[in-house]
Regions:
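Histidine-/acidic-rich catalytic cores in large beta-rich domains
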Residues: 1-382
Length: 382
């Protein structure tokens, strides 16, 4: 399945066969790719594999002047290693709900990159997975057939479900969030890791998405987006879980929902690219704030119970190297059988005003630790 397109892997090298795989691949048998209790037996010698890849095409409906870096999903038979099904995003432009202003902005894009394999990255799909068994299909809604695919577009701000048989988009949120049921979601900007929470996990059947913020969407030109590209902008991230039938938000982690009365500056969550969200068996959500290399576990009530910041830099020799993390998953200890299970030590975070850095000799200054802080005495704790 790597014989998909001829190209150069690196400048100066000869032409070779490339799959041009990017962002995601999923083996059928686990719809989300992360741990689900009693649902983790994968036969990698049989079944099928979804691969998300790039493919350069010309499509005059999108842009008459330059080629596209299109997104293509191909399904591979693992036994024969043959491609048995293909879906190209550009073939379905008429099913995506773009208005005339958006289509005009795409037509006006003219910055043809000069690099090998370059072009107009008009859709920028970053995930694909099977829906898997779910209550909506069991209730008679064929849009949610377990073999159907769910995906999203960073550039267009679209979430979509694709019928595996016909290839048509049978369910969609976006690209506009100002009318109808889509309005309940608020604007989804530059999304990543859109997937249906799998059967056996809290929230099963709902859709979970890392709504990055930053900029995305096509529309009329403005001072902020003079070419009509990246017209929707927001400088914070949301993680949202919603009912795909009603599009009612069930749970949202964002500055507007998760701030506590004593948090003067509010929560800090912003990654304008990459990132993900995983529903854990205990009902918590593991969030990868990828641009900052930060992974956190958040409870349903928005408490931070675990945090990790990656110390590893991408290309540490380059100026401005960053500790990016594309996507992190929590897995059980026995998924790494060569390691013994370590002791788990609970941590009491305590109150911030009790945190004191000791001096070089180990002593701690007395700032009234253990007594009611001055601001609480003066305000009555309000």
């Amino acid at each position: 399945f790597d014989r998909w397109q001829q190209g150069k892997a690196n400048e100066g090298e000869g032409t070779m066969w490339l799959s041009r795989q990017h962002h995601d691949m999923q083996i059928k048998g686990n719809p989300v790719g992360y741990y689900i209790p009693d649902y983790n037996s994968l036969d990698i010698s049989n079944g099928t594999l979804l691969v998300l890849a790039h493919y350069n095409v010309q499509n005059d409906k999108i842009n008459r002047k330059i080629r596209l870096v299109d997104d293509v999903v191909y399904e591979v038979d693992l036994a024969t290693r043959k491609i048995i099904w293909t879906w190209k995003a550009s073939d379905h432009i008429d099913e995506m709900g773009f208005d005339n202003a958006a289509l005009k902005a795409m037509q006006n894009y003219e910055n043809e990159p000069k690099t090998e394999g370059g072009g107009f990255d008009w859709f920028h799909q970053n995930c694909v997975s099977y829906l898997g068994p779910n209550k909506w299909f069991n209730g008679g809604d064929r849009r949610f057939h377990p073999d159907n695919l769910i995906l999203d577009s960073r550039e267009a701000g679209i979430l979509a479900i694709v019928d595996r048989q016909s290839g048509r988009i049978v369910w969609r949120a976006g690209p506009y969030y100002r009318d109808g049921d889509d309005k309940k979601l608020g604007w989804i900007i530059g999304p990543h890791h859109t997937h249906m929470i799998a059967k056996g996990l809290p929230g099963e059947g709902n859709i979970l998405v890392f709504d990055n913020g930053g900029q995305s969407g096509y529309g009329p030109p403005s001072d902020m987006a003079p070419n009509g590209i990246g017209v929707m902008r927001r400088q914070h991230t949301r993680v949202i879980e919603f009912n795909p039938l009603t599009k009612e938000i069930v749970w949202e982690y964002s500055p507007s929902t998760a701030n506590k009365p004593d948090q003067v500056l509010g929560i800090k969550l912003f990654s304008p690219f990459i990132s993900s969200a995983q529903r854990l068996p205990n009902g918590n959500t593991l969030i990868t704030e990828g641009a900052n290399g930060r992974v956190v576990e958040i409870t349903k009530d928005f408490d931070l119970v675990w945090e990790y910041i990656s110390p590893y830099l991408w290309d540490s020799s380059a100026p401005g190297a960053r500790n990016l993390v594309y996507r992190a998953y929590r897995v059980p200890y026995d998924w790494v059988p060569q390691l013994s299970k370590p002791p788990e030590i609970p941590v009491d975070p305590g109150a911030n005003y009790r945190f004191v850095i000791p001096a070089e000799d180990g002593s701690k200054p007395d700032f009234g630790i253990g007594r009611t802080p001055i601001w609480k005495r003066q305000t009555g704790g309000q």
